[in-house]
């Protein structure tokens, strides 16, 4: 499979290493910053460089595209690739808003190509360990999730609504939301309460957020997001499951069962 990359930042470097380790052929990179694009191409022995996704698609010979660019580019770059018959993995958040996300899904359905959002935590070994063992907790009643940076936050386009669409909730809270959906077998929401605010920096996006979701299976999820927070009740990407027979969590990952013993995670190398 021939893979191209839109964006040359930290996350796409991880994706490129993973693709190379899987034996995929890295054929093209897209970025309007020539210097960083040239360095990315050199680091991963990528032969083709382009300023736009459209120019790359016009030359063809690409099977899949990894989109890891500022959020406002996710929808147009993804839709262009799907319409060209190219599979797409797009970084989170999927888009700037729900309308764009629906357009992306429609393009995937019409083209027959695969569209995937890169929600990475559901593939983490510790998350999968907790899902595998969550049956020991009985009926899950509620969950708590945290997508919080303490004493730190991003800069650049992340903090501008015209480029990012949202702030800490779209950047960090979305990890906690997708993780709990995975642990609960991807239920549909019945009701959602959400509140965001900006308190710590002069951004025009949120640096603090809260979501409460009532799911169709009767579980209630509480999710916090934040940048520059002075404190968090959980680790940066922690998720906690409260069941009738016990408690489980990731980061640190463990089960606490009714007999007061703890079953800690197996060592995963």
Which residues are covered by each model-predicted region?
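N-terminal Rossmann-like dinucleotide-binding module
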Residues: 1-44
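Hydrophobic residues in well-ordered beta-strands that form the structural core
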Residues: 5, 50, 67, 90, ...
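Beta-loop-alpha module in the N-terminal Rossmann-like domain of NAD(P)-dependent dehydrogenases
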Residues: 15, 44-107
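Basic phosphate/pyrophosphate-binding loop/patch that engages nucleotide-derived ligands
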Residues: 106-114, 128-141, 242-243
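Predominantly a Rossmann-like dinucleotide-binding segment in NAD(P)-dependent oxidoreductases
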Residues: 121-203
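Contiguous beta-strand/loop segments that form the cofactor/metal-binding neighborhood of enzyme cores
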Residues: 178-254
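C-terminal helical cap and adjacent loop that interface with cofactors, partners, or active-site loops
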Residues: 249, 265-269
């Amino acid at each position: 499979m021939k893979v191209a990359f839109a964006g040359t930042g930290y996350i796409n470097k991880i994706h490129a290493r993973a693709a190379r380790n899987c034996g995929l052929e890295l054929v093209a990179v897209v970025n309007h910053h020539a210097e960083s694009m040239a360095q990315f191409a050199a680091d991963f022995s990528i032969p083709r460089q382009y300023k736009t996704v459209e120019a790359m698609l016009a030359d063809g010979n690409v099977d899949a595209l990894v989109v890891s660019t500022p959020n406002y580019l996710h929808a147009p770059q993804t839709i262009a690739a799907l319409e060209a018959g190219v599979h797409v993995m797009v970084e989170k958040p999927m888009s700037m808003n729900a309308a764009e996300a629906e357009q992306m899904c429609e393009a995937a359905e019409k083209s027959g190509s695969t569209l995937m959002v890169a929600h990475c935590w559901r593939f983490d070994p510790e998350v999968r360990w907790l899902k595998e063992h969550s049956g020991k907790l009985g009926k899950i009643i509620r969950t708590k999730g945290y997508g919080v940076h303490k004493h730190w936050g991003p800069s650049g386009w992340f903090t501008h609504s015209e480029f990012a669409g949202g702030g800490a909730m779209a950047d960090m809270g979305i990890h906690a939301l997708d993780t709990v959906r995975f642990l609960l077998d991807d239920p549909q929401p019945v009701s959602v309460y959400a509140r965001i605010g900006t308190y710590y920096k002069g951004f025009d996006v949120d640096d603090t957020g809260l979501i409460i979701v009532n799911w169709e299976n009767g579980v209630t999820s509480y999710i916090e997001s934040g940048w520059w927070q002075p404190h968090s009740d959980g680790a940066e990407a922690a998720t906690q499951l409260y069941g009738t027979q016990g408690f489980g969590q990731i980061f640190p990952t463990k089960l606490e069962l009714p007999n007061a013993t703890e079953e800690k995670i197996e060592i995963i190398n």
